[in-house]
Amino acid sequence: MERRVAIVTGGLRGLGRTMAFGLARDGHSVLAVGHIDADVAEIEAATAGTNVSGHILALVADLRRPSDCDRVVAMARERLGTPQILVNNAGLTFTTIDPARFRRPEPQKFWQVSDDIVRAVIETNYIAADQMARRVAPEIVAHGWGRIINVTTKLDTMNRPHTSPYGASKAALEMATEVWAKEVAGTGLTINIVNPGAGANTPGMAEEMRQMSREGRVPRLVEPDEMVPPLLYVVSRAADNVNGCRFDANLWDLSLPPAEAARRASRPAGFEMHPQPG
């Protein structure tokens, strides 16, 4: 296994934290980026008590700011080496858009969401990912090997009513993945998506939804650890020719060889629009 330098955004909590530790356990050097200062000490303590063959550094940054994206890439390069893997996981969820959605008599309409929330969600879920990708891609292409992995969501979450602008932000990143993958074809950089494939059991999920899942009233939530096997496959040399795909973790079959599990859990990134009439 070749050791690589990885940046995981949204890497101090939830899915990102689990993916950061998964990469480190696989021997990679990881810069985990989040936005809450208290999480840094927790990551450092967890790293000290965990058997990882790689290394994890924790950093607080606001990736909506171009200057902070520059700082993240510079720190990775200075402390760990040239970034070869970027996991764009940072995101704001429904609990940010409408914290009281399960306590409202009527669901929130898109025009009731404040300008500040709309801007924060779009900037965090799409623009931050775009900014980070544009900063690491040139060096990866120059070196001839690397990975960008975006975390989006499933289509029926993107187009679900009363969740705007979450779906729009993830749809933008989904389509960007398709476009970017076409542009880097043949360069050694691949760009793919790794998704839970269903709601994820993280603090970003409303507690009411987590409780309903525990009671069996809604489908099972995906555990963060389920993201690690598809992620490790995508960053491996076995996936050198895998580009422009999305992998849903809830479809990954651990009983199969990774390449076969990947084949069954994957489909092309992006969308097929409704056909023209006639």
Predicted regions and their residues:
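Active-site-adjacent segment of SDR/Rossmann-fold oxidoreductases
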Residues: 26, 140, 158, 179-189, ...
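Conserved glycine-rich Rossmann-like NAD(P)H-binding loop of the short-chain dehydrogenase/reductase
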Residues: 26-42
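Catalytic loop of short-chain dehydrogenase/reductase
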Residues: 92-93, 104-117, 147-172, 177-178, ...
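Conserved glycine-rich cofactor-binding loop
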Residues: 12-13
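The beta1-alpha1 cofactor-binding region of Rossmann-like NAD(H)/NADP(H)-dependent oxidoreductases
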Residues: 60-72, 115
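C-terminal helical subdomain
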Residues: 193, 210-278
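A short, exposed helix-loop element centered on a Lys and neighboring polar residues
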Residues: 133-134, 178
